[in-house]
């Protein structure tokens, strides 16, 4: 009794004593990580009858994609495009605007944040609906069959005590983090990652971006529309490393017309803040001529990719294998060295894409239930939500040439598409690659309006081994942008009608 009274009189002692307590729970499946791979796996596991739990330390479900990636960036891209259209196209569309059109940065950011909040809350509701136990806390391996969940300081709703979860099956889905650039310190104010770029409090006069991949080009598009002078520095000789070469060149042409400046085959030597001038000073070097150039920008965005995130997981504690790139090593059934510990999403092999992660989450759980699961890694679409949008799936021309595969090309421009004409949005084309002998579709590449939506038809065709004629003989509604996809397939095996 005296011991209890003394603890109550000493909050610090009481707090430290409470933290030593543990609560033991048992589950059939525990997923560490609540991003696209993790939360989808958790819901699917519960639907298949497993007693399921998900551990997430962010405090909000959805991972990088929903909180500081795909979703907030699309809100900024959409709203900045509307702003740009009103500024540059209203008059030609017969819309007279009286007064200035301005960006209210606070409300611009609020619209983004509202979308994120609604979607993260929606996932929590799905957890409740499917009876998934949700632990807000740090999850780490106690041993190969136990997960320790510890409180996260300052996180609302975090577990109050350590939990030890006794688990039959574990799925690791801890995701990825921003890849740092050697010698450049990110402060998320003047030198920012993609996370900081999503939440700038004012529009910079000049924005320099290190990296000409999807993240950099999307953020460059946003701020270029809002008035920033955007410079993209890319080490490779072309932007969009995984794009078809022809499409990459067309994309650069369209973005350059919108005001983005490109320095290709260029490396960054250094970058540092100069607070006296309120700028970041950047030194770059042309890799062909070795000529150096000094750049200045109010904001520098470092967008050189992402890397697997396993900090605090305790992978080394149980001997999980990690490769040179920091990825957890698995077999073709997502198994680590322990068959009951599976790994999915960005933390392991394959493209770091939310939809790929979701597919793996479902497949891994189905393997637990039935011994079978399916992800077709040759049919994972990619989309860049610039304007025009860029989307692709399957093989590029470069890949087909390297593999020695004979192929034919079918192309159709949006300038010849009736819906694109009515929308006054005609930049770009659809490009189809087919096997010369069988005429099966090998790859599809779209640059143009709504490319991200249209690419789904290409994915379906690839998944079921369709030929170009199979697609061309499907009746497509008129007038729609999807008719351009039909016509490109017609052009691949015969001739397009409207071009």
From Swiss-Prot:
Cofactor binding: number and manner: Binds 1 FAD per subunit.
Organelle targeting sequence: 1-21
Pfam families cross-referenced by the UniProt entry: Pyr_redox_2, Pyr_redox_dim
SUPFAM superfamilies for the chain: FAD/NAD(P)-binding domain, FAD/NAD-linked reductases, dimerisation (C-terminal) domain
Disulfide-bonded cysteines: 65-70
Positions that bind NAD(+): 211-218, 234, 268, 305
Stretches assigned to coiled coil: none
Gene3D superfamilies xrefs: 3.30.390.30, FAD/NAD(P)-binding domain (3.50.50.60)
Key words of the record: Disulfide bond, FAD, Flavoprotein, Mitochondrion, NAD, Oxidoreductase, Redox-active center, Transit peptide
List of catalytic residues: 478 (proton acceptor)
Single GO term (MF): dihydrolipoyl dehydrogenase (NADH) activity
Superkingdom of source: Eukaryota
InterPro entries per UniProt: Class-I_Pyr_Nuc-Dis_Oxidored (IPR050151), FAD/NAD-bd_sf (IPR036188), FAD/NAD-binding_dom (IPR023753), FAD/NAD-linked_Rdtase_dimer_sf (IPR016156), Lipoamide_DH (IPR006258), Pyr_nuc-diS_OxRdtase (IPR001100), Pyr_nucl-diS_OxRdtase_dimer (IPR004099), Pyr_OxRdtase_I_AS (IPR012999)
Binding sites annotated in the UniProt record for FAD: 56-65, 74, 139, 174-176, 346, 352-355
Cofactor: FAD
Cellular location(s): Mitochondrion matrix
PROSITE patterns on file: PYRIDINE_REDOX_1 (PS00076)
Entry EC no(s): 1.8.1.4
Function: Lipoamide dehydrogenase is a component of the alpha-ketoacid dehydrogenase complexes. This includes the pyruvate dehydrogenase complex, which catalyzes the overall conversion of pyruvate to acetyl-CoA and CO(2), and the 2-oxoglutarate dehydrogenase complex, which catalyzes the overall conversion of 2-oxoglutarate to succinyl-CoA and CO(2). Also acts as a component of the glycine cleavage system (glycine decarboxylase complex), which catalyzes the degradation of glycine.
Homology family: Belongs to the class-I pyridine nucleotide-disulfide oxidoreductase family.
Subunit structure: LPD1 is a homodimer. Eukaryotic pyruvate dehydrogenase (PDH) complexes are organized as a core consisting of the oligomeric dihydrolipoamide acetyl-transferase (E2), around which are arranged multiple copies of pyruvate dehydrogenase (E1), dihydrolipoamide dehydrogenase (E3) and protein X (E3BP) bound by non-covalent bonds. Component of the 2-oxoglutarate dehydrogenase complex (OGDC), also called alpha-ketoglutarate dehydrogenase (KGDH) complex.
PANTHER family named in the record: DIHYDROLIPOYL DEHYDROGENASE, MITOCHONDRIAL, DISULFIDE OXIDOREDUCTASE
Name of protein: Dihydrolipoyl dehydrogenase, mitochondrial
Biological source species: Saccharomyces cerevisiae (strain ATCC 204508 / S288c) (Baker's yeast)
């Amino acid at each position: 009794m005296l011991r209890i009274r003394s603890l109550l009189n000493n909050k610090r002692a009481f707090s430290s004593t409470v933290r030593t307590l543990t609560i033991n729970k048992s589950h059939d499946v525990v997923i560490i990580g609540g991003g696209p791979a993790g939360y989808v796996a958790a819901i699917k596991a519960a639907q298949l009858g497993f007693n399921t739990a998900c551990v997430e330390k962010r405090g909000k479900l959805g991972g990088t994609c929903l909180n500081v990636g795909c979703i907030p960036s699309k809100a900024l891209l959409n709203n900045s495009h509307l702003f740009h259209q009103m500024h540059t196209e209203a008059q030609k569309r017969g819309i007279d605007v009286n007064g200035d059109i301005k960006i209210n940065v606070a409300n611009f950011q609020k619209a983004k944040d509202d979308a994120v909040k609604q979607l993260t809350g929606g996932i929590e509701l799905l957890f409740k609906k499917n009876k998934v136990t949700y632990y807000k806390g740090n999850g780490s391996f106690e041993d190969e069959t136990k997960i320790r969940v510890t409180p996260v300081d300052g996180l609302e709703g975090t577990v109050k005590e350590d939990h030890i979860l006794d688990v039959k099956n574990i799925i690791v889905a801890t995701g990825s983090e921003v890849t740092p650039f050697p010698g450049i310190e990110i402060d998320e104010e003047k030198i920012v990652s993609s996370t900081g770029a999503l939440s700038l409090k004012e529009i910079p006069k000049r924005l320099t971006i290190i990296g000409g991949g999807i993240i950099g080009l999307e953020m460059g598009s946003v701020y270029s529309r809002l008035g920033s002078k955007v410079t993209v520095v890319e080490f490779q000789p072309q932007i969009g490393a995984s794009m078809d070469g022809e499409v990459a060149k067309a994309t650069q042409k369209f973005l350059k017309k919108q005001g983005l400046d490109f320095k290709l085959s260029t490396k960054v030597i250094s970058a540092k803040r100069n607070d006296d001038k309120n700028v970041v000073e950047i030194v770059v070097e042309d890799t062909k001529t070795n000529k150096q150039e000094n750049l200045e920008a109010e904001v520098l965005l470092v967008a050189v990719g992402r890397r697997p995130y396993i900090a605090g997981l305790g992978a080394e504690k149980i001997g999980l294998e990690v490769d040179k790139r920091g990825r957890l090593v698995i077999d073709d059934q997502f198994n680590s060295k322990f068959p009951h510990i599976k790994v999915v999403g960005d933390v392991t092999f394959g493209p770091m894409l939310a939809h790929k992660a979701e597919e793996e989450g479902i497949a891994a759980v189905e393997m637990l239930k039935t011994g079978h699961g399916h992800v077709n890694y040759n049919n994972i679409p990619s989309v860049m939500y610039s304007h025009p949008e860029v989307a692709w799936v399957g093989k590029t021309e470069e890949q087909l040439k390297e593999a020695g595969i004979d192929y034919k090309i079918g192309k159709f421009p949006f300038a010849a598409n009736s819906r694109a004409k009515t929308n006054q949005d005609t930049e770009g084309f659809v490009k189809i690659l087919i096997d010369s002998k069988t005429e099966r579709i090998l790859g599809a590449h779209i640059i143009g309006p709504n490319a991200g939506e249209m690419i789904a038809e290409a994915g379906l065709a690839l998944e079921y081994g369709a030929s170009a004629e199979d697609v061309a003989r499907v009746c497509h509604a008129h007038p729609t942008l999807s008719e351009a996809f039909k016509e490109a397939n017609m052009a691949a095996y015969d001739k397009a009608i409207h071009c």
